[in-house]
Amino acid sequence: MGFFLTLNYAVANTDMGTAPAATDPLGGRVLTGHPEEQIDYATRSTNLMTVRSKQIIKAFYGERPNKSYFFGCSTGGGQGIHEALQFPGDYDGIVARAPGMNGTHNTAANVWDYQAFNGPANVTAAQATAITTAVVKQCVGKDGGLSSDNFLTDPRDCHWDPAALQCTGAAADAATCLTAPQVAAMRKFYEGPINPRTGERIHAGRTRGSESYNGYPAALASLATTDGNSNYWVFGNDFDWLTFDFDHDMDTIDDALAARLNANTADLEEFKSRGGKLLLFHGLADPMVPTLNTIDYYERLITSQTHDGRHDDGKRKEGLRRTQEFARLFLQPGVAHCNGGAGPDATDFLSPLVQWVEQGIAPDQILASKIANGVTTFTRPLCSYPALPRYSGVGDPTEATSFACVDDFDRDDNQSPARKYLDDGDNYPIVPIDDRDHGHDHDNR
């Protein structure tokens, strides 16, 4: 918030109704048994913050603000998508980074990993580092990046198998090799949650190259007791994540919470018709919120913009053009969850949005930098999806100007969930708040 204050914006923030959670050992489980607070968490708090902030701005400055922008990452990124869907007049522009917009299924993906890495299958931090090193060694430089990179530009083109690190009995690799249960767990990590009865995909898996971020997946054992909050809301605070059934229990969770927590609907027509602009960003080495979920959402936006739902080459180009008129996705090679990772994670996210909203100039490329000890070590362009940066073969490889945004990569399936897991259900009834006639008024700067 402080940074935006230095730019002379009026800034507001919300804890989404979870104030005790920051200090309570139960974390988000403090909302168990409190459905109204769960609605606050899902959507209402952000809209209420927006409306009340505009009232305060008018009272202080004597006039309503003329433009407003939303900025959020992870859960905050998901809130941005909820705003565009449910309250499309709240903001002129939205930056949604690593958006956790599919609440029930992102939690299911976490529980999937908790179960996979439980007990003897748990992977240590040293093993996770060895996995990422092996992944990069096999796949780097084949996807537009440099052969000297220590991250992947497009992990979707990488098919490294964790069996390559399976223990052979040699003493030299004892600390970093993988046992058979660990190999199986890593395969599930990349696969993502599947309904065991129907074989339907519930949610995307994790990308290769994301394994060693922030102690993940080694930290899963401790996270398991504090995360998965929405499961506790339905099954109670004694919920045992080891017993979660990805068929029946998943349906129970979705029946109870999907309409509140999930923003899967790829229909942003009202936001678009109001002139709203959406910038999506997601790190391609994010192990917390699967990048492939955001890619799938954007692909469904493209399909929705063909108007007849067709996805052949001609219609896809038409849908992409229409989508890029109001929404653009920028994938961040080597960037982990919101920031961090080996890739260039320092980016001015807001200025391109402001320029798009206020001057009508849509961003095709955005500069990203890697900064170490206050020094920029290299830069790369972030490219408007579906393009990714490719080294031109000439020029300083540490400079973004030596890369072009190119879309000629062959890519595999983006792990699209089954249709039933993209249904948000009926809109959850949002309790009205007063002074809803705020139309296009926006947060000041």
Give the ranges of each region predicted by the language model.
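C-terminal His-loop and adjacent cap/lid subdomain of alpha/beta-hydrolase
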Residues: 1-445
